[in-house]
Amino acid sequence: MAPGRTGAGAAVRARLALALALASILSGPPAAACPTKCTCSAASVDCHGLGLRAVPRGIPRNAERLDLDRNNITRITKMDFTGLKNLRVLHLEDNQVSVIERGAFQDLKQLERLRLNKNKLQVLPELLFQSTPKLTRLDLSENQIQGIPRKAFRGVTGVKNLQLDNNHISCIEDGAFRALRDLEILTLNNNNISRILVTSFNHMPKIRTLRLHSNHLYCDCHLAWLSDWLRQRRTIGQFTLCMAPVHLRGFSVADVQKKEYVCPGPHSEAPACNANSLSCPSACSCSNNIVDCRGKGLTEIPANLPEGIVEIRLEQNSIKSIPAGAFIQYKKLKRIDISKNQISDIAPDAFQGLKSLTSLVLYGNKITEIPKGLFDGLVSLQLLLLNANKINCLRVNTFQDLQNLNLLSLYDNKLQTISKGLFAPLQSIQTLHLAQNPFVCDCHLKWLADYLQDNPIETSGARCSSPRRLANKRISQIKSKKFRCSGSEDYRNRFSSECFMDLVCPEKCRCEGTIVDCSNQKLSRIPSHLPEYTTDLRLNDNDIAVLEATGIFKKLPNLRKINLSNNRIKEVREGAFDGAAGVQELMLTGNQLETMHGRMFRGLSGLKTLMLRSNLISCVNNDTFAGLSSVRLLSLYDNRITTISPGAFTTLVSLSTINLLSNPFNCNCHMAWLGRWLRKRRIVSGNPRCQKPFFLKEIPIQDVAIQDFTCEGNEENSCQLSPRCPEQCTCVETVVRCSNRGLHTLPKGMPKDVTELYLEGNHLTAVPKELSTFRQLTLIDLSNNSISMLTNHTFSNMSHLSTLILSYNRLRCIPVHAFNGLRSLRVLTLHGNDISSVPEGSFNDLTSLSHLALGINPLHCDCSLRWLSEWIKAGYKEPGIARCSSPESMADRLLLTTPTHRFQCKGPVDINIVAKCNACLSSPCKNNGTCSQDPVEQYRCTCPYSYKGKDCTVPINTCVQNPCQHGGTCHLSESHRDGFSCSCPLGFEGQRCEINPDDCEDNDCENSATCVDGINNYACVCPPNYTGELCDEVIDYCVPEMNLCQHEAKCISLDKGFRCECVPGYSGKLCETDNDDCVAHKCRHGAQCVDAVNGYTCICPQGFSGLFCEHPPPMVLLQTSPCDQYECQNGAQCIVVQQEPTCRCPPGFAGPRCEKLITVNFVGKDSYVELASAKVRPQANISLQVATDKDNGILLYKGDNDPLALELYQGHVRLVYDSLSSPPTTVYSVETVNDGQFHSVELVMLNQTLNLVVDKGAPKSLGKLQKQPAVGINSPLYLGGIPTSTGLSALRQGADRPLGGFHGCIHEVRINNELQDFKALPPQSLGVSPGCKSCTVCRHGLCRSVEKDSVVCECHPGWTGPLCDQEAQDPCLGHSCSHGTCVATGNSYVCKCAEGYEGPLCDQKNDSANACSAFKCHHGQCHISDRGEPYCLCQPGFSGNHCEQENPCLGEIVREAIRRQKDYASCATASKVPIMVCRGGCGSQCCQPIRSKRRKYVFQCTDGSSFVEEVERHLECGCRECS
């Protein structure tokens, strides 16, 4: 037997043994350990918030609770929860789950609670929960579910709480809830439900909570049952509103009368819906059982497609794999097209169960191997296209079930041989394509030549690639004897039937036996396909710079030697040598390696010789050679090693020779260990020598004494490896995330092999130039930065870049060569910038681009942008979002749909648009400055002499700015630091004349006078008794010409002035005041007091006498009035009533002596009255009477922790209580109080309730509050207004909150039945006056204030005159209405005519009254016009003179606010939204929306909150099947 054959047989046996070992491991008992990163406690497993993308493996079988919320899980498979038979609680909320495979919960028999809310589910598979009979709570809210199929909840008969709110549900199939007999809570709010079948809730006897609000309910005859059903159950289904038809929009379903629920035309049963028809993926289109997802950028096979599909088209996407059972549920599928994707991995059972499949198209992918059994069971398959892949092997039984196959294409693959018998099962084959494969025409392919000669079905012209003697010859034309085998060919191909075949010699290489010599070929990377038999691989003298981790050595089990010498290798990636356990010799001599780490040699466990000579290595770390326990020879000769970390060679247990010569070793304290190691180990080393310090130079390291290895100062070990991830970022494999870090530049330490780089949300102003050095990048996210400009060739080195995100920056201009070199780019996002133009040719290199985002840019759509519109239309690379902003004729038009001929140039372009790509065109540099473009600042100005600043607007001639103060003169001077000098006027000094010298430093003021500095002088302020310029003259105030004392007072001179001695009866400093001695007079009996000098005189009334009129006349006691000794206050008059004195109070006052002010009139703008807080208790009764003719104002206000206000609002009384711990509550009076009359208002606070009573009517209550209102404890009570300094700060203000004061009268304010006294009125400026005089003038009418002290009267009917005190006559007395009724209008009247008459006096006969009897309206009602002519008012959907024409299906735009119910608050959009209402006839079909889109709107709620929600807007109406 040949040696080669023996070796191959051993390899096969080794693989079989390995497979058996793996099978035994996999079949063993599962580990009970906790999944990685998760936390396990008892029977609970917590994996929440770990960023997981899939359900982790290894979940303990005894788990009862599993938390997987707040991760990034996208798919739930059938295997994820296998064996978890004890699980009771499962949390999957807040993930990205879009697919749940059927049977995913089949083992969860004990499951009680399942949360799947806040995911991306669009389809709810039928029978998903049939194996969870104990489920009681199921939360599916906040997903994207579109329909509820009939069998969705089969099996969960015990569920009590089902939450389906905040989805996109528009269809609920009949019987969907039939199994839910124990259901108590059902939430369906915030969906798109328009119809609900009458049987939907019949089987829910225990239902106590039902939420249906915020849907699109169409209230026609089919929904009448729901109105009755809700009226019988008033506590559930609250806020359920009609949204159509238009005349019922906004009405509560329960409140609409049954007669209003009508259907147009004949009707019987409600139209049924099909939930499966709604399960079309959002990126695809579905019609006629065909799903079309072509060119949608999909990365995986869409799940939950309509079950009845017969064809799916997935070509031209980015799908990389086909998972197990991807199409198993689509039993009717006949055609699958997944061509032109990136598929490299296909599960063996990907097409399982597709017995009806006739066509399978897989061409244009990256398939290298067909898994065993992939096509098994496809008995109906007729067309199979596998061309344009990378298939290098086909097992002999690959096509064993394809008896009906007609056409098979294997064109353009990597097949070198085909096993005999591969095509034997193909009994119906008619066409076979095998060309463009590198066939090795040896003895193993002889059968194919015979087969093709007998069956001439190969039509593509398959040819031999090797050996050379048969190269390029057609296989079908070569004679059988030409197919011969050499030794290597036999070794290579004999196991081809099981895909153990080997490859031919790589291009540019030479193969001799098992030696593959690829040296000196200028290769930049290791060839991707090498023969399996290779033992010696020679790659020396090439241009390889980086050794990638491609896994190439895993395919070379026989490899023993690798020569990579004399390349340009700078980096060896981790895992580059994985699978090279059999390699014994590795040559890396003569490269450019600078650093080494243990991961770079991973996989070389059998290595014996390692040559690293002549590199740039500077240090050797203690993990550099980890795992190389078999190395015997290590050469580090001729490097730049200065230090070696202790223990660097410890793992080299087999080492016998090490070459460390020609290295600049620094023999400091860190190298002491090496001397000891060399002396201790008997090893050949060549005696490496020290180069530093100087006194140890050229001394062998092993000869240096231990005390001579010293460190001076801070000599750190230089072998500390730099981190592979910047400290501001996080790195996972080759993905680097530096988002929202406030970065201004690219962080240092970026891994060279980074493939995805996220830099969004930083402060970058330009694309970092360093990015061009990272050539492996496939994705760059630079969104939400401040990048304002791109430069040409910015990304030209990034040949692998497929996604570039530049959205939400400040980009103003796109240079024509900005994207040159990006031939692999598929996604370019320029969304949300300031781009107005894109030069033609900018996208010439973007040959792979499939998606371009240009939305939210102010595009200027003239002729220069015509090319872009054509380019977009040609490839549909822009999804129809980008709109034109200018010129005006193109505003708001889509680039995708606007006809090309509309892109025209008319007149000059706005300079602000042109300047975006050349800011200098807008002449930003002033004062003759020179402008030049700048990539960051947009432009830069070079200023002329004497100007500076960004725009050259700051003058350097500082005299222009008048720097000299106080009138100083400026002179330019180069010798001064500031370039100028000042000539100061007298009295000032300093560089800018800013200093006024103190002239008081040397003054002549006398007698302790005060000196006051002036400008170049000073003044003396004299003390008392002194005068003169210098205060040197004495003053005598008592000389006659200076005596100031009055009324003959005596002047007395003092040292510091004078004083006056007053005569009796006078006072004051100068005796200027005549004292009023009547202030405390003793005159009696109403005598008049007359003041005199130092006394007073009493003038007695008639009959009285005495000094104080104390003697009455004779008989006076019999004539004394009771009022004589009774004093009335505030100008009241005393009268005698029943022999008792009584005060007749003026308006506004009350009390026995009119001492209390109980009525005040508020006439000022900011008037108010303040009552002390002590007057109000937490439980209080406040009452008052109000008279006003104003609509709004503040009656009462109390501001503290729980603000309370009693307001006049639109003529009604409004009570507002605004607790800071809960939403504000409001109640309004039914009565109006703005008629000028007095109305009683009462506020009662008791037992956590607030009640409002107006005019003794029915109380209005705010209901039970959370706590007792804390009114009146810490702050005052304001009536009629508030101080301007206070404001309504404590109350949450709204658009309807009146901030103005009250204008009118407030009378009899009582707090806890105690009448309040307003005596302590504010100052008159506040506009509060006693009484309410203006309201008592008009006898039979209402007072209206026209000025501060003036009123006019508005009389009641039947009264007239200025004061409404004259009785008016009835104007209808003696009226002249002939055939009608007289109606009085003030002082006149009008005639209301009877039917058949007209005219001012109803004296003209009208013959048009019966005109409608002969005028027929088919679909409307007849009316008479102002001219007496009949006309038809048509029903919606009809037109014509007689409403006989049915309108075509058209959309009518209605602008109105969209309403939502959020908990107990009513919410509406901030502005009116255009809504399209479809009206018109469609015959047997229905007029319905056929095109719509979703837009985001802001909703504002009555509780003060707001939120943003996507709302579906209809764009086009048409006829379609009724649903």
UniProtKB/Swiss-Prot annotation:
Residues 918-953, 955-994, 996-1032, 1034-1072, 1074-1110, 1119-1155, 1340-1365, 1368-1403, 1408-1444 form the EGF-like domain. Pfam families: EGF, Laminin_G_2, LRR_8, LRRCT, LRRNT. Residues 1449-1523 form the CTCK domain. One of its GO terms (biological process) is atrioventricular valve morphogenesis. SMART domains: CT (SM00041), EGF (SM00181), EGF_CA (SM00179), LamG (SM00282), LRR_BAC (SM00364), LRR_SD22 (SM00365), LRR_TYP (SM00369), LRRCT (SM00082). LRR repeats lie at residues 62-83, 86-107, 110-131, 134-155, 158-179, 182-203, 308-329, 332-353, 356-377, 380-401, 404-425, 533-554, 558-579, 582-603, 606-627, 630-651, 753-774, 776-797, 800-821, 824-845. Residues 215-265, 437-487, 663-713, 857-907 form the LRRCT domain. Residues 34-61, 271-307, 496-532, 716-752 form the LRRNT domain. Residues 1158-1332 form the Laminin G-like domain. SUPFAM superfamilies: Concanavalin A-like lectins/glucanases, EGF/Laminin, Growth factor receptor domain, L domain-like. GO terms for cellular component: extracellular space. Glycans are attached at residues 72, 192, 563, 622, 784, 792, 797, 928, 1025, 1181, 1247, 1406. It is found in: Secreted. One of its GO terms (molecular function) is heparin binding. Disulfide bonds join 284-293, 441-464, 443-485, 505-511, 509-518, 667-690, 669-711, 920-931, 925-941, 943-952, 959-970, 964-982, 984-993, 1000-1011, 1005-1020, 1022-1031, 1038-1051, 1045-1060, 1062-1071, 1078-1089, 1083-1098, 1100-1109, 1123-1134, 1128-1143, 1145-1154, 1305-1332, 1355-1364, 1372-1382, 1377-1391, 1393-1402, 1412-1422, 1417-1432, 1434-1443, 1449-1487, 1467-1501, 1478-1517, 1482-1519. Residues 1-33 form the signal peptide. InterPro entries: ConA-like_dom_sf (IPR013320), Cys-rich_flank_reg_C (IPR000483), Cys_knot_C (IPR006207), EGF-like_Ca-bd_dom (IPR001881), EGF-like_dom (IPR000742), EGF-type_Asp/Asn_hydroxyl_site (IPR000152), EGF_Ca-bd_CS (IPR018097), Growth_fac_rcpt_cys_sf (IPR009030). Keywords: Developmental protein, Differentiation, Disulfide bond, EGF-like domain, Glycoprotein, Leucine-rich repeat, Neurogenesis, Repeat, Secreted, Signal. May act as molecular guidance cue in cellular migration, and function may be mediated by interaction with roundabout homolog receptors. This is Slit homolog 3 protein. It comes from Rattus norvegicus.
